[in-house]
Regions:
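Active-site-adjacent bridging/hinge elements
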Residues: 82-87, 197, 303-316
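Polysaccharide-binding surfaces and accessory modules of carbohydrate-active proteins
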Residues: 236-297
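Non-catalytic terminal regions with compositionally biased, polar/charged low complexity
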Residues: 31-33, 39, 326-332, 338-418
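Short, hydrophobic/aromatic-enriched beta-strand segments in well-ordered soluble domains
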Residues: 235, 288-309, 332-343
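A surface-exposed beta-strand-loop module
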Residues: 313-332
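Ser/Thr/Asn(+Pro)-rich, low-complexity disordered segments
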Residues: 1-5, 16, 67-70, 100-116, ...
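Catalytic and substrate-binding regions of extracellular carbohydrate-active enzymes
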Residues: 17-18, 24-254, 330-332, 336, ...
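Short, hydrophobic/proline-enriched secondary-structure or compact coil segments at domain edges
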Residues: 190, 277, 281, 369-377
């Protein structure tokens, strides 16, 4: 992939500095690049560095707007600490011919390492033996398809039915972005055009709970549809499977999960059912343990998939995923938490805090106006997150009763730590 050493990023830094507000933090990036453009923007950067104006670039949470006028969706980036945890949430426009059918998808990073990945593109850039170094056919049959991303696929078809012209007409709508508090940062957006008749509303929050070792990510995908559909909700994790709290069967031989729209490239390695209303799936990646805790229904199917089917030239990575399949469903909520915890040392060969701190995750309220999710830890302490689903202002007051208890707040959401 690209880095800030590429010529295009040298151009971007110099132009942004010269024509922007001359942010001195950009100068530190230019110093690392050790290269400037031979024009007035590059000269301005060089003079700024010469005069000692450079400052360290601070990576902070930011909402980047898409489109010529900044009104075609965007990308929300939530960060905790010094890149301790970084969430990249996409609610942008199609992205011209490079665009993927990946509305409301996201990637998650831990100190720069991928935790939940976006596959990216199917191309070995400038490696002649691989399709001349150009885009491979799998870029269209896999990488662009919705099922290749951490987002919702309906009825095994991609967003906009995989049609570029249709996708180019629409973009997702930001509900709100709030990174004003370090311990609770939230981004929320809606998509109403990817599947006609279906509304997807995804809210992602980066939260630091006092009883937990690390910050965690709360993911609420609210789906509204008058029709009965099959929903597939994958998590493309990076690492080695450690544990899960459900039983599954592995087939004697691997067969593709489907025939088209990317499904033809996925092998089904395991299939099971939830053993409880809270399903957990853990893995180890880059020396850190991660647990996905998700609220499941008894009828859900839990799938373990592996990329690589219908790939005789080995153009695709053999990446794995955990997938929730929910059939014959209209309105529903997928509520999940991704929790980093503990570590494993290959030097001492010791593991620490390898178990999740979460005992239960539950959708305790859901209607058109509000969705509430509770997180209960193993000590019985309960945290509560309530989302106002309708577009509202920071000043709007809300009142809701859940289980006989009343909650009042102002703004887009309510959150209370245990």
């Amino acid at each position: 992939g690209m880095s800030y050493y590429t010529s295009s990023l040298v151009t971007a830094v110099d132009v942004a500095y010269y024509y922007g507000e001359k942010n001195p933090q950009l100068l530190s990036i230019a110093q690392q690049q050790n290269e400037v453009l031979l024009d007035e923007s590059g000269l301005s950067v060089a003079i700024g560095i010469r005069d000692g104006k450079s400052q360290p670039f601070v990576k902070k949470s930011i909402n980047l707007r898409d489109g010529q006028n900044g009104d075609q969706g965007g990308v929300g980036i939530l960060r905790y600490g010094n890149e301790e945890l970084t969430l990249v949430f996409k609610y942008a426009a199609q992205g011209l011919s490079h665009g993927h059918y990946d509305k409301l998808s996201y990637s998650l990073y831990d100190k720069g390492n991928e935790v939940l990945q976006d596959y990216g593109l199917a191309r070995f850039v400038n490696i002649g033996q691989k399709g001349g170094g150009n885009y491979l056919k799998e870029n269209k049959t896999w990488a662009k398809q919705t099922i290749a991303h951490n987002t919702l696929t309906q009825n095994q078809t991609s967003h906009f039915n995989g049609d570029y012209e249709t996708g180019s007409k629409y973009h997702s709508q930001l509900q709100f972005f709030d990174a004003s508090k370090d311990d609770v940062q939230v981004v929320s957006a809606k998509e109403v055009n990817a599947y006609p008749g279906t509304e997807m509303h995804r809210t992602m929050a980066m939260i630091k709970l006092k009883n937990y070792e690390n910050p965690l990510v709360l993911d609420i995908m609210k789906v509204s549809s008058a029709n009965k559909n099959q929903y597939d909700f994958p998590f493309y994790f990076m690492g080695q499977v450690i544990n899960m709290n459900f039983e599954y069967n592995s087939p004697d031989s691997l067969i593709p999960l489907g025939k088209d729209n990317g499904y033809q490239h996925l092998y089904l390695e395991g299939k099971g059912k939830p053993s409880a209303e809270t399903t957990q799936f853990s893995w180890l990646g880059n020396g850190t343990f991660y647990t996905l805790t998700t609220a499941t229904n008894a009828a859900d199917e839990l799938l373990l998939t592996r990329l690589g089917a219908k790939d005789p030239e080995f153009n695709l990575r053999r990446d794995a995923a955990f997938m929730i399949r929910r059939k014959a469903t209209g309105d529903t909520v997928f509520a999940s938490v991704i929790e980093p915890h503990g570590n494993y040392s290959s030097v001492s060969e010791l593991s620490e805090n390898s178990d999740s701190s979460i005992a239960q995750l539950k959708v305790v309220f859901d209607d058109a106006n509000y969705t509430a999710v509770s997180i209960t830890d193993k000590k019985g302490q309960v945290s509560l997150f309530i989302l106002a689903n309708m577009q509202s202002s920071d000043a709007k007051q809300h009142q809701l009763k859940i289980g006989g208890k009343s909650f009042e707040w102002t703004g887009h959401y309510y959150f209370k730590d245990s």
